[in-house]
Amino acid sequence: MKLTPEQQAVLDGSKGTVMAKVMKTLVMYGDAFGAEKMVPVTSTYGHTVISFGINAMKPVYDLYDQLIEAGAFSEQKFTADPLPLDKNVPSNPLQDLVFHQFMYKQQARYEAQLRKLGILSDKDYTCTCYLDEVGNKPKQGEVLSWAESSAVVYANSVLGARCNRNSGMIELMGSIAGCVPYFGFLTDDGRKADWIVEVRTTKKPEPQLLGSAIGMKVMEKVPYVKGLDQWIGTEINEDAIAYLKDFGAATASNGAVGLYHIEHLTPEAVQQGEALIRDGAPVYVIDDAELQRVRESYPCVWKDLNAKPKLCFMGCPHMTLHQLIDTTERVEASLRAHGQRKVCIPTVFTAAPGVIEAFEKTEYAPRLRNTGVVLSYICPLMYMNNPLSKAMPVITSSNKLRTYSTARYYTEDEIITMITKGAN
């Protein structure tokens, strides 16, 4: 790899041994992927995927202590993934004991480290850092050093930023050094589409199911999606933002997609059209039957397949303000239709602290509370990682949470019926 004189000097120790190790780590990372050079990180803010102080990762926090002691702070302020704990989320005393004494015992230490390393504020913990209410929204063409898969695929695809699917710690090192290896999605060639996906459904496809189908088919490749614009339009509005957020998270978790193009909608597809597609790209046709086949392939790992759900999570990735308002109205309407006043299953909606703050200023916040739904900032997966949570029959509208936990997937319509009518 060819480094600039400044980068080479850091590697040689001009800023101390710790910064030399940071640069060496990035160089080795780039070498592994054939990068020939480093390029500057040009976004205003960074983002780190590690937001939890779990005992098993104590060596990570020890390494962060070394960075802090050496003054190796991030060159850019950053946001972080959601926090793991919220006393308002339903849990029993045994679960709380495991959360606080065994799983997240390092939490206070780690949050203190993030404050020293450069986190924007104590409320900037979310997987949807790119939403306006949070403010970490990169511009088209900006180079990022992020790792959170749902944020990376959104930034690459919907915003046109440039970021690889980095790992945790590597992404923070890129922010500290101010540069990242030049390969993959940072290059023009790496952003070309390897697959053509033709959407031929008879109704608007569930974003979680469509994303899942595409992710499992193309894996880490780049899909160019045709026919979806007839269902979600050709403008990046609030509906499209919510749809693409959930769609992208499913492609990234059910597969390994880091970039997708939606014909007539996402910026590079609008600007370049089919010129983005590689010669000889295979075609994947998705119709109603294919989506049904994909859904029926999901395993259910509950001990009792007919168990009554004990908890419901919606918001993985975190919900948008538009989604919170829309879903509040839908829950209210369904409760009225079923002659109920409050949800029949303990239900948690999750959103970014900044989004929750904005939601609390609307008339919908007290209305949601009146339905019995809990609004939280946590990461549902961090809750589900508790062994006692894994044993619970939990339902979710998130295909990402389904993939990474024992939660059982249902569509949003099904979830709303289940929590307002009851389900067995």
Where are these regions (language model features)?
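Non-transmembrane, aqueous-exposed alpha-helical and coiled segments at domain scale
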Residues: M1-N424
